[in-house]
Amino acid sequence: MEGERAAEADYTQGQIMVIAATERNRYQNIYTSQLWQVEADPEGNTFEEVLKDQMGRFLVELATVDQMAQEQGVELTSQEEDSLKSLSQEYYAGLTQEDLDYMGVAQDEVYDLYCMYYRADKMVEEMTQGQNLEVSDAEAKVIEIQQIRLDTREEAEEVLTLAQEEGADFASLGARYSTDSQLARSMEWSEEMDALGDAAFALEQDAVSGIVEQDGGYYILKCVNAYDQEATAVRKERLAQEKKSEAFSGIYEPYAAEHVVVLAADTWESVDFSLGEGCTTDNFFSLYQSYFAE
């Protein structure tokens, strides 16, 4: 069902090509150009068609959030504008002639696109302020364990006795007896864990569990790192971003339903991934992150 108002996203063809070239090259620089005509879904769409559809959704969402930001009076400071100008200059200076020939974009178009992207980011930050987005260390906790899997309880009891002996080498026991070649595992805490998760997070550093029965197997666990600091920090950041995205979705989705934004019907007509040989630029977003990483 269409919303009350519809608007066409105000992108230049050069800006469309910046996004298209960036996303095309992120894949093509790794997998070569042969992937574009590969069937990518059950409907028979090619990888190029699927990627263009994904880019289309991104561009619509970006334009919608930018429209929200302008209606809410979200403005850029002079310092932010200066940073975005420097960013645009660095990005543009890094483009080769082949990049420019394929994208056909001017530096001021790059600057306007970066401003739009930054304003959308700023909108998300301002609209989610005051909401509880905190993620505790306990909530994000990641641990490392070693596990031995046995097929019968009798075998598990025998191996557990060996594992509990003073000076026992748990890893060697696992290599000798476990029916699962995967000895080491990282585990993430969650509110709904299975029996293995519950047993693992109950262990202190270097402690060995009892026998844990799950999915037809019998497990013995050893905690080798009760707090993986680096992995926990990475997960904490990811969970916080997920909370922020979820909080903003509650604001964005009702707005988007009432303020429909569409791309021009001919947006992709002149975007051909088979052209632009020699165009390899793929750092539009990564360069932005290097300037404005939290």
Annotated model-derived regions:
Residues 1-103:
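N-terminal targeting/tethering segments
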Residues 20, 85-88, 174-178, 239:
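A general structural motif at alpha-helix termini
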Residues 27, 59, 63-76, 88, ...:
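Sec/Tat-exported extracytoplasmic proteins
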Residues 46-63, 75-82, 109-118, 150-154, ...:
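Soluble non-cytosolic domains of exported or imported proteins
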Residues 72-81, 170-174, 209-212:
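Surface-exposed patches in mature extracellular/periplasmic domains of secreted proteins
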Residues 99-158, 192-294:
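PPIase-associated folding chaperone regions across multiple families
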Residues 159-196, 225, 229-230:
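Peptidyl-prolyl cis-trans isomerase
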